[in-house]
Amino acid sequence: MSTIAVIGSVNLDLVATVKKLPEPGETVTDAELSRFPGGKGANQALAAQRLGSDAKLIACVGDDAAAVEAQILLLEGGVDLSGVQSVADLPTGIAMIAVAPSGENHIVVAPGANRALTPDVLSVPVADALICQLEVPVDTVAAAARSFDGFLCVNLAPAMHVDVEILQRADLIIVNEVEAGWYGDSLSAASGMIATTVGAAGATITKNGEDIAFAKPPRIEAVDTTAAGDTFTAALTVALVEGQ
């Protein structure tokens, strides 16, 4: 069994299921509202745990009811939450998600306590692999990259400027096709593998500009694509660490 540490976000997702995603300036009034635990870090940790790994989450939440609700599935799933810190002066992160019948979504995140996971409070555990993403301060990701000696996966989402040291240190970088376009040629600084997901078309893995793998998923009827990328990130990391 592999041990997977995840440094990342914990959110409470407010999901509005709509018949059609609104256009800019448009209001839709037919939504059905649901609440779910979420956050890229939480999603990745839970996925790794469900895939048979021993997962530990390092994160920050608020001292509020949303924090309890956001961690329910993690607790039930057996994820080690000893690295989750509660902060008094910021609320738990909230993600507002609109989902269309096709499964496509629009997401807006209010990070709240996720911003409190700064390098000075960071404790990087011993693990076979570490997964990071960018819903926590990028300085924290850089600090983790410097101090962690094992397999490092960095999900460069949401897209933003990152130090070249992160690109050079990561054994695996994961982006979707939109993020890959945003980063452009800067990804050429990466020394490890780059996995680019292209939705229903699958994913390509490259290294040093050369394609080394391609996976095309089976056709299914999409219900909700929320957290699909997070699940892929966890699954690929677990598979590579365990030599699958």
PLM features: residue spans?
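Conserved phosphate-binding/catalytic loop of the ribokinase/pfkB sugar-kinase fold
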Residues: 83-87, 95-129
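Conserved phosphate-binding/catalytic region of the ribokinase-like
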Residues: 1-4, 185-244
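Structural motif
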Residues: 3-5, 128-129, 172, 193
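Conserved beta-alpha-beta core of the PfkB/ribokinase-like small-molecule kinase fold
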Residues: 127-187, 201-203
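Short gly/ser/thr-rich secondary-structure transition/capping motifs
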Residues: 111-117, 153-159, 215-217
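Short beta-strand-to-turn element immediately C-terminal to the catalytic PLP-Schiff-base lysine
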Residues: 99, 176, 204-208
